[in-house]
Amino acid sequence: MNKIMSSYDAISLIKNGDTVAVGGFIGCGHPEELTIKINESFLEKGFPNNLTLVYAAGQGDSKDKGLNRLGVEGLVSKVIGGHWGLAPKLVKLAIENKIQAYNLPQGVISHLYRDIAAGKPGTITHVGLKTFVDPRIDGGKLNDITKEDIVKVIEIDNKEYLFYKAFPINVTLLRASYADEFGNATMEKEAVTLDGLSMAQAAKNSGGIVILQVEKIVANGTLDPRKVKIPGILVDAIVISKPENHMQTYAEQYNPSYNGEIKMALTNIPGLKLDERKIISRRAAMELIPNAITNLGIGVPEGISMVANEEGIGSGLKVTLESGPIGGIPAGGLSFGASINPESILDQ
């Protein structure tokens, strides 16, 4: 079977009404070529339509890229997502009651991929208790037309937990750096690896398919097997992307310090401009504890490690991001999710 095909042929494998899981983290690791072609196909032919979209991190640029390509009335009918803030076109559909919409914790969705892959009935965790995700409050539902309960409260050994129900995934859309002709894929030029393997396994265990976007295709047997992150036995279609649709982040085509190809000199890292965000970051940096493991989130926290580096205390920090990098200096803006000079990069 020839797995290498055009983007249009690949997305023609998606059926109306399918549940589609899409990888990525802001602009890192998002299969932009595929979401562009889904958008174009729907606008030209009305196909595919009525999709259920599932994603963990928020893939988007707050404008038109990423999941915003799918924010068209009729293309999607339901969204189960972690971070919505960078996909305003999906947000608009949810606010206007044009789609069913759920907001679940990002990490829970990552674990759901693993549990769907394992054939489990769902994910059990304390995360979300007594928040808007708790079914006794909103159950993660974002509008009036969203009725189905996909989260419930259970009790184990007299302790309450939330049970997030598993569901079949018909199609998974992923991105890698290189793939061989069979579909074995490596991610050496990606800033993060994210949930790729779990998402692929979740689709295959649901009887679904995996469509992979790559920068280049190489001959079978030429990839280092230790670097293969997604085995070809899980891949159904491979699409070669245009370079502009395979940027390492939405801000940069390629930065070798994000994926460990080089170590950037700290003196070459530009500082933040002096504004209210930098002032807040500087004040927050004063609370940092040397050698403590510190997790930074999106938004204002992005600047904390930059300020720490400017002040000469960055080397004493162990900064982590939920996207996977440990150590280094987290990038900001549309490169958030990547880190400059990371010590290691784990799955999300």
Q: Residue spans of the language-model regions?
A:
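Conserved alpha/beta enzyme-core scaffold
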Residues: M1-Q348
